[in-house]
Amino acid sequence: MSYTIHGIQHLGVGVPNHESAWKWYRKFFGMDIPLFNDEAEAPLMTIYTKGKVISKRAAMVLNIKGGCAMEVVSPTTFKASNSETEFQLGDLGIFVGMIKTTDVNKAYDFFKTNNAKLLSTVLKSNYGQDTFYVKDLDDLIWQILPANDFYTNHNHITG
């Protein structure tokens, strides 16, 4: 059995502290190539901000090994905070981000050695593949999955 993810260009991640979050994503996910990194008003976000135009800092960052990208976004006109609603798997939106690795066990050891907030040990996915779950600095959940479709031989454990 196999799986394919279709239609996701990149994953936007809202964080309260842009600098520390990006540092974590560089360290654990290899997101070290900025495509842009800027601060600007965000008029398209008014549906999420009760009609108010806010300013935000955003960086689109890329992992050169696997080609995945994420947009790290942090408001600058207010301090971001977690929702008062406790979301559950199956609610609207993306609940778990997914990151590829060439070796799940080596990735797990890297995350453990570097004191990441591991949510599981290495376990079997529904597809019978090794996987594990981790939380980032802002308690967002990520699943680390095996893959062999990488663009380069970059030495980072994830891609």
What are these regions (language model features)?
Residues G14-G67, K106, T113, L123-S125, ...:
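Core segments of cupin and vicinal oxygen chelate
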Residues N63, V73-P75:
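Acidic/polar N-terminal loop/beta-strand segments that form early-domain functional surfaces
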Residues L92-V96:
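Eukaryotic phosphotyrosine signaling hubs
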Residues P75-F78, A147:
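Acetyl-CoA-dependent GNAT
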